[in-house]
Amino acid sequence: MKGLGSTIVRSLPNGARLVCADNTGAKELEVIAVKNYVGTVRRLPAGGVGHMVFVSVKKGTPEMRKQVLPAIIIRQKKEYKRADGTRVKFEDNAAVIVTPEGTPKGSEIKGPVSKEAAERWPGVSRLAKIIH
C-alpha cells in the first residue's frame, strides 16, 4: 500500500451507502468502519477515495448479504483536489470488495477507478478498465 499524493476529502462516514462496482454478487454496501482511522472525540470515522473500509453488504445475493468485508473506495461524489491543482469528482460513491491484503475478490470492476486508488492498490489497478 502506497501513500496518497492528493488531499483526499474524507466524505464517507460510518453509515454511508456505496455502490459495489465489482461482480462479487453484492449490490449495495454500508460503511461500518474505516481502517487505520485516528480521529477526535465525537467525530464519526470517515474515508475517501483510496481508503480501505469495512462494509456490511445490504443488497445482493443471499450468500453475500449480511457479511462484513473489507473494501476499497474507488469513487466519491465529493470533489477532491489533486497535487497539480485539478479537482475531481464522480457521479456516485463506489467501492470494490477485497481481501484483507488488498487484492480484489471479483474478476472485473465496473466504471472508472480514481487514479489515487489505482496507484495505492495495484490489485485494483490491474482490473480497472478506466483510470480517471
UniProtKB/Swiss-Prot annotation:
One of its GO terms (biological process) is translation. It comes from the Archaea. InterPro entries: Ribosomal_uL14 (IPR000218), Ribosomal_uL14_arc (IPR019971), Ribosomal_uL14_CS (IPR019972), Ribosomal_uL14_sf (IPR036853). GO terms for molecular function: large ribosomal subunit rRNA binding; structural constituent of ribosome. One of its GO terms (cellular component) is cytosolic large ribosomal subunit. PROSITE patterns: RIBOSOMAL_L14 (PS00049). Pfam families: Ribosomal_L14. Keywords: Ribonucleoprotein, Ribosomal protein, RNA-binding, rRNA-binding. Belongs to the universal ribosomal protein uL14 family. Binds to 23S rRNA. Forms part of two intersubunit bridges in the 70S ribosome. Part of the 50S ribosomal subunit. Forms a cluster with proteins L3 and L24e, part of which may contact the 16S rRNA in 2 intersubunit bridges. This is Large ribosomal subunit protein uL14. It comes from Methanococcus maripaludis (strain C5 / ATCC BAA-1333).
